[in-house]
Amino acid sequence: MELVIGTKAWSTWSMRPWLALKKTGAPFTETLIELRQENNMSAAAIKPHSGSGLVPALKDGDLTICDSLAICEHLAERFPGSELWPRDAAARALARSAACEMHSGFSSLRSECPMDLNAPVRVADLPEPTAKDLRRIAELWNDLLDRFGGPWLGGAEWGIADAFFTPVATRLRTYGVRLSDFGDKGLGEQYAERLLERPEFLAWQAGA
């Protein structure tokens, strides 16, 4: 397998399936394309690998799969023993719901607090739409951690939902955000710390 990704310091969408693929333990080749190059060179470099013209893209045999969530779903089917989705049906349904909410939502947090793993820690002056996103994240994390007992959103096993929220944890750190200011009951901040201690994330960060 070959996973085509963008700049590790910035590309949240590349990070998510990379973390999931690392958890499976399957061997893969990483093709890194530097983003934000001048003269549209990044797009030109991506296009031969990805029909969508976007990263990430996973090449698995004669398949090329674009989009981070589609890649993660493929990995969950390809490596069922890795438990990328919870075994329990209720936990699996809500973990999927959380991952999809992250996939399609929280646009203000994305725009106001872009991921940059090499940026110094700084406190951001957050507008109300971003605060609303953070309140929802705190609520979602606390609900799932309380319901399934943690330490991960679906229970005992780290999985796709956790991969999808790992970039959020980096944003909290980079921008000096305390989830307790947005309704966190204590579970969310601890969870964010655990995400940033995962060996998969530490390996990604080391390459940034």
Residue ranges and their predicted role:
Residues M102, F106-E197:
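GST-like fold's C-terminal all-alpha helical module
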Residues G207-A208:
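Exported/periplasmic ABC-transporter solute-binding proteins
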